């Protein structure tokens, strides 16, 4: 159930996200599943001899649209709606959807009819292949007992994944620090955070609290206490959940008679098998270990100089990294992340991001006025900017009806093709932290495109930005997630199943990682001035220092990514062990060692959900991303290249394998040269 709205004096009928109550979530979910069952039954009733692409593939596309029209909106409301009752209803609905989808892809009658299709186009051929693989990965070809066990496991994994994410999202733990423990923190941060009756600072774990604290608090004991609390926010329950998830995944591998869950998963990805992943991680390890040790040595020098500790005793702990890296950046590159917020005011940065995207991809974003409905906004705090320094991107003030949103801080934009004004789709931006909201930054492809059905896309950007301005790191994150949004809303695929980010898991991060580079180039950053007349001028000398400061610490950063990826693969291996035991052992083998009393696996939402045996994909995709940047040459704002990227990569979704799309864009095979140079800080 996706709402549509035609505005007065506006000929566009746009799809919108319905703002549902808890009762409506249940009703919408039930009705959608009932209608989908009827549509699937019609497909199953087609005689094998009468099968065509129209009565099977096209009919499936229409059934998939019914499902997504309901569960796309439910999925985003489940993660961001201010009312807990709606989020809880979303948990139940998404579990029901997952169970339905497993049943659907275990239907032998449906499977037989898909196999009987004779495709007449490349898109039909790819959809037929994708559907057959989805059936086979859901157990349709397994013996009945194994098929039923797969169904039970799949349902349980969905329940566990939902509970894991909920435990992190709704953990309201706060830590209290004395004013002395907060020495070094910027005054705007101190003015913003709440205090208890004794005047102590009360800090949660949202990004706007966490990042400044770990970068600036001079008290090492305070940083350690915050680091431990943040690392343990997943609770002991999540450790038990993850161990059960790992065991169930291994059982799936056993049902398919393959050595490991990694074998079961990677066969559908660019790497094709876990051996390729391990070789890739080994190559990263051979390059990154020395770089990480070198970076830590430089931080030790800073710690020794600042604290008076002898260099051989100035060991860097995990709660030291961000603090001393910032001091090194200040000393060596004259870069102060907190001071950078004046260059990147939050609202102006969002406007700049939209402007850059317009120029690159030949689109236009038109902001519409919005109206929050269906939630008690008076009891929901949200860290919005106190002032608006942006020069444009104000909402329209004509007689068009406001767009309904779930919170009064949420923005909505129509997306138009700049060449002819054609309406392409819509995007929602939910930018600021609040209680109960998803804690990280992510994009939701709420509504995928289907040119076959005349369907337009909707994407949602969810972040937890500091309302008073962004650091350079936060600007990169904003661009990264908006890269996912663009991948969704600029998709132009024939079938819904191929739309947007529905690509191989180890490719999905590449377009968004590529977009991060626009945060570090003069030709793009110079445009910030057009969106904030009061901001300091960004000059080439500053950009050069930003780039140098960003490159420092690459060994530490990629060393951590390597640890995450290797940990994920170990949990998906032939003989998985308890997650805490594995983590203690693997983190303990790194240069900084394991921090006793911490349980990071309980917060690792990626591997509790769709990224299992897939976290390596962040680095694998980075190889592709940095190579694709090379196609822009010396000018990242080259609109001709940007529109080629839109046409050859973003618009195609998964209508072709990712490798073929990338090689078509580059005109050659992918090279890892730029990636390994980045690891070395070059």
List the predicted regions and their residue ranges.
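Alpha-helix capping and helix-loop boundary segments enriched in small/acidic/polar residues
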Residues: 236, 272, 344, 469-473, ...
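N-terminal helix-rich structural modules
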Residues: 2-185
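Short, basic, low-complexity termini and linkers enriched in Ser/Thr/Gly/Pro
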Residues: 302-306, 370-388, 392-403
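Short pre-active-site segment immediately N-terminal to the catalytic Zn-binding motif
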Residues: 465-479
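Active-site-proximal, well-structured secondary-structure segments within enzyme catalytic domains
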Residues: 123, 127-129, 156-159, 166, ...
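Short, hydrophobic/amphipathic alpha-helical patches that form generic packing surfaces
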Residues: 65-76, 133, 228, 321-327, ...
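C-terminal, non-catalytic "cap/extension" segments appended to globular domains
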Residues: 2-27, 31, 200, 348, ...
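Short His/Asp/Glu-rich catalytic/ion-coordination signatures at enzyme active sites or charged loops
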Residues: 10-24, 73-93, 116-152, 202-239, ...
